[in-house]
A protein has these predicted regions:
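Carboxylate-rich, polar loop motifs that coordinate divalent cations or form catalytic acidic clusters
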Residues: 1-236
Length: 236
C-alpha cells in the first residue's frame, strides 16, 4: 500500500510540475521585420556553437539569440551560391554547413570566412547532377544522393586546409552497380553502407572500392530488383 501511495504521489507531483512548467512557456514570433531575410523557412539547424541557422527562400540566416545575419548570393559578389532558395541545411563534424538549394545543387559554407563553394565544383564531373539528399556521417564524410546518377562521396582533408575530394559511385562510372542510392548508413566500425535498388554496398574506412552484397547480376552491371531502404546496427 505504501508503495502504491508513493508512486501515486510521484505521478501527481510530475503532473503538477509539468502543468506548472507549461504555464511559463512563451513564444516569440520572428519575421522579416526582425531581420529574417524571408518569411518562408524550409529548415532549421542548431550548430555546435548554439547558433540557429535558417534555410529560407532568400539565403541562410544565422541567429545568435539577439540578431539575424543573412548570407546569400548578391549581384557583384563572387561567391559560389547558385540559388538563394535553400531547402536543407546540415553541419559536419568540422563545423562547415552543407546546403541543398532549390536547383538541386550542393554548397559548403564556411562560417569562419563566410564563403560558399559549390560541391562538386562547377565544371567538374558531378556538378550538374540533381541531388535530392545530403547525408552527413559521424566521421565527417558527406554523401550526396542523386536522382539518377548514383551517389557522390565527399571527403574533407583537415590537414590540408579542409580540402575536398570526391568519388562518384554509379554504374556509369563502373565504381558501383547502381544508379539509385536510397540511404547511406555508417556503422560502429566506420563502414559506410549504401542501400540501393540493386542490393547493398559497403565501403571500409580509408577505402575507395566498395563490396557489393545480394546482387545477382545478369550482365556486367545489370541486376535483379533487390531494393533496400533500412538498416540497423545491432548491439553485440
Amino acid at each position: 500500500m505504501m508503495k502504491k501511495t508513493l508512486i501515486s504521489v510521484i505521478l501527481l507531483l510530475a503532473i503538477v510540475f509539468s502543468t506548472h512548467a507549461q504555464q511559463h512557456c512563451f513564444f516569440t514570433h520572428y519575421s522579416t521585420e526582425d531581420g529574417l531575410s524571408q518569411n518562408t523557412v524550409m529548415n532549421i539547424l542548431q550548430d555546435h556553437k548554439d547558433n540557429l541557422w535558417f534555410a529560407t527562400w532568400d539565403g541562410i540566416n544565422r541567429f545568435n539569440g539577439y540578431t539575424f545575419k543573412t548570407y546569400k548570393a548578391r549581384q557583384g559578389n563572387y561567391i559560389s551560391l547558385t540559388n538563394n532558395r535553400v531547402d536543407r541545411i546540415y553541419e559536419d563534424r568540422y563545423g562547415f554547413l552543407w546546403l541543398l538549394t532549390y536547383d538541386n545543387r550542393v554548397h559548403r559554407f564556411d562560417p569562419k570566412t563566410e564563403t560558399f563553394e559549390q560541391v562538386p565544383a562547377a565544371g567538374e564531373e558531378g556538378s550538374a547532377f540533381n541531388v535530392h539528399t545530403i547525408e552527413v556521417m559521424p566521421n565527417g564524410t558527406v554523401w550526396l544522393l542523386t536522382e539518377n546518377d548514383g551517389a557522390i562521396r565527399i571527403l574533407t582533408h583537415p590537414n590540408e586546409n579542409h580540402r575536398l575530394t570526391w568519388d562518384i559511385y554509379s554504374s556509369k562510372t563502373e565504381l558501383f552497380p547502381s544508379l539509385h542510392v536510397f540511404k547511406v548508413y555508417q556503422d560502429k566500425a566506420g563502414n559506410d553502407w549504401l542501400l540501393t535498388d540493386n542490393g547493398l554496398g559497403m565501403i571500409h574506412p580509408g577505402k575507395k572500392e566498395p563490396d557489393s552484397y545480394f546482387t545477382e547480376t545478369k550482365g556486367k552491371f545489370g541486376g535483379m530488383n533487390q531494393a533496400f531502404y533500412a538498416v540497423q546496427d545491432r548491439k553485440s
